[in-house]
Amino acid sequence: MGTCRESEPTQIFVPGPIIVGAGPSGLAVAACLSNRGVPSVILERTDCLASLWQKRTYDRLKLHLPKHFCELPLMPFPKNFPKYPSKQLFISYVESYAARFNIKPVFNQTVEKAEFDDASGLWNVKTQDGVYTSTWLVVATGENAEPVFPNIPGLKKFTGPVVHTSAYKSGSAFANRKVLVVGCGNSGMEVSLDLCRYNALPHMVVRNSVHVLPRDFFGLSTFGIAMTLLKWFPLKLVDKFLLLLANSTLGNTDLLGLRRPKTGPIELKNVTGKTPVLDVGAISLIRSGQIKVTQAVKEITRNGAKFLNGKEIEFDSIILATGYKSNVPDWLKENSFFTKEGMPKTPFPNGWKGEKGLYTVGFTRRGLSGTAYDAVKIAEDITDQWMKFNGPLSCRNICSSHIIHLHFNKS
């Protein structure tokens, strides 16, 4: 008797690039390619666009920078949007962006492995449903693909709720509770501020030095002021000006337990990727005592935490505002372009292109403006190659979501 053999995974040939990730970065590349007539396919592990924004951000979140610094290529924000759009408005902008350029990602496709095949000269991207194959691979999973959970001694002993900010929505779930907030970046500051709205008692852990700047100065964006000054003055001089501005509006934050780094805010961002905190009200609550600043945690106990200064405090809940990391090393089988942490080895502005048709977007540590820059560069480069392979007519005859399915069965 004959036996039925298991069929090979479905082979899906993509005439244009495969883009992994349907966040703003992946959509920006797809839009720029579509505008040039080059097809692409986006593989997205979740069931929606911009899943970080839709599923892993808190309700009160707004863009930290003015909207004109956060626009995706080819489509500005609506004029009636406020200077700092809310999370909900940004999501609506992203959805409108995808609709305008007819971008239709393949959802619920978790990339298990992507590797280059030297024999065929193609990238093979394996998901649970098949293997996508293309000449080009664009990594658009970004710097914030996975939450970072710190290794704090005793954390598993704690009997109360422990929540990463990726799962935090609002302070309503922590009303009237004493909460330990681990982390003092923009998320840690904003979560602490939000907790105060619900009469919670946040204690924010500050382990390292941190730059805090006012978000605005006399109605002008601090970031906008910095970008304008950098066109005319050296970086170190602009950093000195920003610190003078911060001290004049926020006071000496060292006195609040927020030590400033010796390196200036912009230089530190460029070198390490550490973003300065843009204050939206937390500093005044720290000064009034509504938000407590604490030293680094020595260990977590069943009911609270012991600190390096010897103090021990009981807490009802712990919120981990400890950021995110790249997940590229988990699935991309390539070790010459990315570091072991999953970041491009080549710094901005040249970190968008690797070898053998590999590209990366959303890893600039320069927010959405860096994403837009990379997306345009990638689309230009791929279009040049596409034209050589296919000619100008092909660019207009294939829609952006076109893919060819090839089924191979064992004999």
Swiss-Prot record:
Q: What does the function comment of this entry state?
A: Involved in auxin biosynthesis. Both isoforms are catalitically active. Involved during embryogenesis and seedling development. Required for the formation of floral organs and vascular tissues. Belongs to the set of redundant YUCCA genes probably responsible for auxin biosynthesis in shoots.
Instruction: Give the similarity note.
Output: Belongs to the FMO family.
Molecular-function annotations in GO: indole-3-pyruvate monooxygenase activity; indolepyruvate decarboxylase activity
Write the protein's name: Probable indole-3-pyruvate monooxygenase YUCCA4
Give binding positions for FAD. 21-26
Tissue-level expression reads:
Expressed in leaves, stems, flowers, buds and siliques. Detected in the apical gynoecium and in the developing ovules.
The record's GO CC annotations read: cytosol; endoplasmic reticulum; endoplasmic reticulum membrane; Golgi apparatus; Golgi membrane; nucleoplasm
Report whether Nucleus shows up as a keyword of the record: no
The answer, when asked if Oxidoreductase is one of the entry's keywords, is yes
**Enzyme Commission number(s) from the entry:** 1.14.13.168
Task: Describe how expression is induced or repressed.
Answer: Positively regulated by LEC2, by NGA3 and by STY1.
Effect of inactivating the gene: No visible phenotype, due to the redundancy with the other members of the YUCCA family.
* Residues the record lists as binding NADP(+): 183-188
Q: Which Pfam families match?
A: Pyr_redox_3 (PF13738)
Q: What class of enzyme is it?
A: oxidoreductase
Q: Which domain of life is it from?
A: Eukaryota
**A Gene Ontology biological process annotation?**
response to ethylene
Q: What does the record give as its pathway?
A: Plant hormone metabolism; auxin biosynthesis
Co-factor requirement: FAD
Keyword annotations = Auxin biosynthesis, Cytoplasm, Endoplasmic reticulum, FAD, Flavoprotein, Membrane, Monooxygenase, NADP, Oxidoreductase
Reactions accelerated catalytically: indole-3-pyruvate + NADPH + O2 + H(+) = (indol-3-yl)acetate + CO2 + NADP(+) + H2O
